[in-house]
């Protein structure tokens, strides 16, 4: 954990593709913002359309580039979506500075597809990237 670090020890703390694998993601997120002015968090988006189709049609947990494990050997214990994460931030009064929607196969995407991914990230993005801060008193 981050208990050994004093408040405001860092400018930025980064957690890359690990949020879904920690025991208490909400507690860790708050601790990240205790030790740093801002946090950057990335995680696989469980609501991606391919995951939805796989689960809906095959009735099995999806395995993909973003989620490369079978259900029984995955380190992922708290899968979430863009909307889930944004709800968590709202519940804990965390300010979302930036949100980026990324597709692992984005290299071949047209500008139109990239725009669609930004407009419908919960459906079309494989990976979520957020930059967050503590909400400043108004």
Sequence positions of predicted segments:
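Flexible, charged surface loops at secondary-structure boundaries
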Residues: 6-8, 123-124
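Short conserved loop adjoining the S-adenosyl-L-methionine
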Residues: 1-7, 23
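Short, catalytically relevant binding-site loops at active-site mouths
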Residues: 1, 20, 46-48
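Short, flexible segments with low predicted structural confidence
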Residues: 3-4, 11, 57-61
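A short SAM/SAH-binding and catalytic strip from SAM-dependent methyltransferases
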Residues: 11-24, 43-44
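Alpha-helix C-terminal capping/helix-to-coil transition sites in glycosyltransferase folds
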Residues: 8-9, 35
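S-adenosyl-L-methionine-dependent methyltransferase catalytic module, highlighting the catalytic core
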Residues: 27-31, 38-137
């Amino acid at each position: 954990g981050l208990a050994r670090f004093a408040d405001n020890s860092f400018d930025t703390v980064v957690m890359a593709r690990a949020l879904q694998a920690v025991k208490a993601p909400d507690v860790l997120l708050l601790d990240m913002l205790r030790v740093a002015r801002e946090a950057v968090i990335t995680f696989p988006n469980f609501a991606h359309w391919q995951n939805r189709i796989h689960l809906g049609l095959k009735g099995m947990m999806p395995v993909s580039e973003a989620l490369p494990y079978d259900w029984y050997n995955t380190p992922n214990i708290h899968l979430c979506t863009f909307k889930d994460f944004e709800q968590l931030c709202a519940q804990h009064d965390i300010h979302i500075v930036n949100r980026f929607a990324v597709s692992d196969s984005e290299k071949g995407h047209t500008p139109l597809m990239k725009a669609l991914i930004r407009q419908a990230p919960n459906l079309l993005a494989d990976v979520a990237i957020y930059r967050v801060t503590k909400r400043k008193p108004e």
